[in-house]
Design a protein with these regions (language model features):
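Active-site beta-strand-loop-beta-strand hairpin of nuclease catalytic cores
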Residues: 23, 56-70, 78
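Structural alpha-beta junctions
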Residues: 20, 24-25, 102-108
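Acidic-basic catalytic patches of nuclease active cores, encompassing PD-(D/E)XK
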Residues: 1-47
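Well-ordered, non-membrane alpha-helical segments in soluble/globular domains
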Residues: 89-100
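Anionic group-transfer/hydrolysis microenvironments
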Residues: 59-61, 74-76, 80, 115, ...
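Intrinsically disordered, low-complexity terminal regions enriched in charged/polar residues
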Residues: 126-166
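Short beta-strand-loop-alpha-helix junction that forms the active-site gateway
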Residues: 3, 73-90
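Nucleic-acid nuclease catalytic cores
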Residues: 103-130
Length: 166
């Protein structure tokens, strides 16, 4: 197995452990995650039940209490932050958002780590979340997205996320 796949899997495990700790619920990395219903395989989703989709949508298996939420995980060496100040956005982020919006109908969060820069969370600016610190809003293809530090983000939004899923 190549180093990049191992790096991605370890970050997915990190995110699952972090979310489990925050929500006091069980989150697990999806075994063999990697676009089972995403990308070229998006047509598979129409054949699956809601329960089956929970097991293969995103990179993290969510507990039933948060079944309306999808988590994608990414770990990259570099990220061109300066490109976010242009309406075109950053190529990695653009691709992640496009893939996520095509493959899931649920509320989604893209959690990503950039080497030597930290962990961040990206999501639609339409969500009514609380920001525990500063955040950045960018416009990509005429839609607005927010990016915030992962630090205390989900801790600050436990109630909101559980409410929208009930």
């Amino acid at each position: 197995m190549n180093a990049n796949k191992n790096k991605g899997k370890s970050f997915e495990r990190f995110v699952a452990k972090h979310l489990s700790s925050v929500f006091n619920l069980n989150f697990e990395r999806i075994p063999n995650s990697g676009a089972y219903v995403g990308g070229k395989n998006v047509s598979r989703a129409s054949k699956l039940t809601e329960e089956q989709l929970l097991l293969c949508d995103g990179d993290i298996i969510v507990p039933k209490e948060l079944s309306h939420i999808c988590f994608e995980c990414k770990w990259y060496k570099e990220f061109s932050w300066q490109k976010l100040f242009k309406n075109k956005g950053e190529s990695h982020l653009n691709k992640w958002i496009e893939q996520t919006e095509v493959t899931t109908k649920r509320m989604w969060f893209i959690i990503f780590r950039i080497n030597r820069q930290g962990e961040f969370v990206c999501f639609s600016s339409d969500y009514n979340v609380t920001f525990p610190g500063s955040y950045f809003e960018c416009k990509i293809n005429d839609k607005f997205y927010s990016i915030a530090s992962l630090d205390n983000f989900f801790e600050s939004n436990i109630g909101y996320m559980l409410r929208i899923c009930s």
